[in-house]
């Protein structure tokens, strides 16, 4: 997953902002700063494929990002972009410190206990503000919510495709 050509979903156009062609973006990256340095974004077209657009400016606005695109100066120019997903190339993103991961690198990992018991696949991540929560699907309809805390998540090996956890007592009984 280290290819610089890999596209990376970082957000979604949730609405327009004002009348000057700005877009309100919901960030999926958890790091607003990753938007601020972007020079271009790729927006997924309805029928598939990507459209690359140059970024004029990106700024934080509460929990959203306000994105201005070069050449788009009127609300009518950007209405068709509402609801679309925003991607960037992986090499446009900042490098992470040890122990930090992009969500796309965690999704799909096999989650197991420190004893080697397989719990299931990490299928979603919920951002709660204080810490993320990993949604793991076991067999059937079984869903396990695992707090993304240092004392719970013991090891992440993206190359091997697995995460090792030490579950808090009673978590599986819920």
Curated annotation (Swiss-Prot):
GO terms for molecular function: ribosome binding. One of its GO terms (cellular component) is cytoplasm. GO terms for biological process: ribosomal small subunit biogenesis; rRNA processing. The keyword Cytoplasm applies. The keyword Cytoplasm applies. Coiled coil: none annotated. It holds the Pfam family PRC_RimM. InterPro entries: PRC_barrel-like_sf, PRC_RimM, RimM, RimM_N, RimM_N_sf, Transl_B-barrel_sf. It is found in: Cytoplasm. Residues 97-171 form the PRC barrel domain. Keywords: Chaperone, Cytoplasm, Ribosome biogenesis, rRNA processing. Belongs to the RimM family. The PRC barrel domain binds ribosomal protein uS19. HAMAP family: Ribosome_mat_RimM. PANTHER family: RIBOSOME MATURATION FACTOR RIMM. An accessory protein needed during the final step in the assembly of 30S ribosomal subunit, possibly for assembly of the head region. Essential for efficient processing of 16S rRNA. May be needed both before and after RbfA during the maturation of 16S rRNA. It has affinity for free ribosomal 30S subunits but not for 70S ribosomes. Binds ribosomal protein uS19. This is Ribosome maturation factor RimM. It comes from Geotalea daltonii (strain DSM 22248 / JCM 15807 / FRC-32) (Geobacter daltonii). The lineage of its organism: Bacteria, Pseudomonadati, Thermodesulfobacteriota, Desulfuromonadia, Geobacterales. The gene is rimM.
